[in-house]
Amino acid sequence: MFQMKEYQIHLELDRSQQHNFLYPLLFREYIYALAHDHGLNRSTIPLENGGYDNKSSSLSVKRLISRTYQRIHLSIYAKDSNPNQFIGHNNQFYSQMISEGFSVIVEIPFSLRLVAFLEGKEKEMAKSHNFQSIHSIFPFFENNFSHLHYVLDVLIPYPIRPEILVRTFRYWVKDASSLHLLRFFLHEYFNWNSLITPKKSNSIFSTSKPRFFLFLYNSHVYEYESIFFFLRNQSSHLRSTSSGLLFERISFYGKVEDLVQVFVNDFQDNLWLFKHPIMHYVRYQGKSVLASKDMPLLMNKWKYYLVNLWQWHFHVWSQPGRIHINHLYKDYIYFLGYLSRGRLNTLVVRSQMLENAFLIDNAMKQFETTVPIIPLIGSLTTARFCNSLGHPISKPTWADSSDSYIIDRFMRICRNLSHYHSGSSKKKSLYRIKYILRVSCVKSLVRKHKSTVRVFLKRLGSEFLEEFFTEEEHVLSLIFPRAVFPSRRLYRGRVWYFDIICINDLVNHDKFEIFPN
């Protein structure tokens, strides 16, 4: 209790404008306890690793704090200190602990500013409760993208250089000691092989990535978007509500105005060349979409400015293939696990005036979303549910489990896929994925009982695993009474759910990797 009160005292320092408080928190045990409690709901390494009990975990934290303090103190005087001996030895357990603890520390000033900002936005946040679902993005696409023509499909570039991250963090935190410590940690990270998550997990957003890297990446993306929104507002002379999130930036507008001046001087282009009020920007994780109604000249201008922004301000080389200019009614956009594009539907109307009859073709614009079958089969192949050709195979790792457990696991995967891809315009691809999982479930049970598929299905009957194909209809029947929707048209149509807050695990993420400076 005393430690939590002490923690509250440290948080109150922000109100008195004392910013030099982050560094001492590194040597407080309760910081690592908070990191441990936060990690219980994540796939991070807990403090009790390798058979440690709570008592030995506390001793491990004390030992880590002692070694950290001694090593930092000695590194001030020793010029040729070995970075691999920062905590005594290369130990992934200790490195994960210090990573999680430091991530809690650097998040404190951001959390305080965010809470203060949201206190004045409670009414607006209550109105936008449904928009917390990532499925709410697609109704936004349907309402706003159907009358647009061109889309910039952007993958935010990487790698992130350590010094760029320190510079970004300096805009937010005025604690010099913490900045030096952050720089020290970053260079240590790039020298410690044990601190970098194995390359088998390529996505920065995977649950196996340390919280520290997620925080640094989000800080980098937010810095990029802050400048991007500033350029967007300057070009259209409109103020975006997103600019309200710029808390206490150090001479932010002056810095960005200098950046704009550099753009004008170095590239001999003016911002008025891409002025247009109809422009929409959407981002999820490392993928963003920029849509406009104008001709390709505008999109080429934005591509040109984004590439130069990344190269000259963030010192990141953007590969040409990371930005694509797509025609909304000719090319597909891969976003949030869906293939989306505009579609023109022709409606023929027969009209008659006096004795003359004629047909009128009316073109109606719609936004179409479909399930990408090839990436999903690739994910199922990686998860060992099928081979590279899409042929179902058994799941040998579940062979020791009970029949009910195996069926429940497969049913849960099918249920989540149906729930996530319920907004697909065409269900045929989704039915194929369900078929793969259904046969994989049968083969897993057959492998366990050392039988054949024919004998196994004959013994259980034809109703076995029918719920693989009827689960979505069952859920919709609970939401919409059949008396209101007597036909099956509802089940074939698109349904967006507002309770989905994260992307499905089987949807491929964009690859992300951090390289040393």
UniProtKB/Swiss-Prot annotation:
Q: Which domain of life is it from?
A: Eukaryota
Q: Name one GO biological process term.
A: RNA splicing
Q: Which HAMAP family match?
A: MatK (MF_01390)
Q: Which UniProt keywords apply?
A: Chloroplast, mRNA processing, Plastid, RNA-binding, tRNA processing
Can the keyword NAD be found in this entry's annotation? no
Recorded family membership:
Belongs to the intron maturase 2 family. MatK subfamily.
Task: Output the Gene Ontology terms for molecular function.
Answer: RNA binding
Pfam hit, one: MatK_N
The entry's cellular-component GO terms read: chloroplast
Which residues fall in a coiled-coil region? none
Subcellular localization is given as:
Plastid, Chloroplast
Main function:
Usually encoded in the trnK tRNA gene intron. Probably assists in splicing its own and other chloroplast group II introns.
Q: Which PANTHER family match?
A: MATURASE K
Q: What protein name applies here?
A: Maturase K
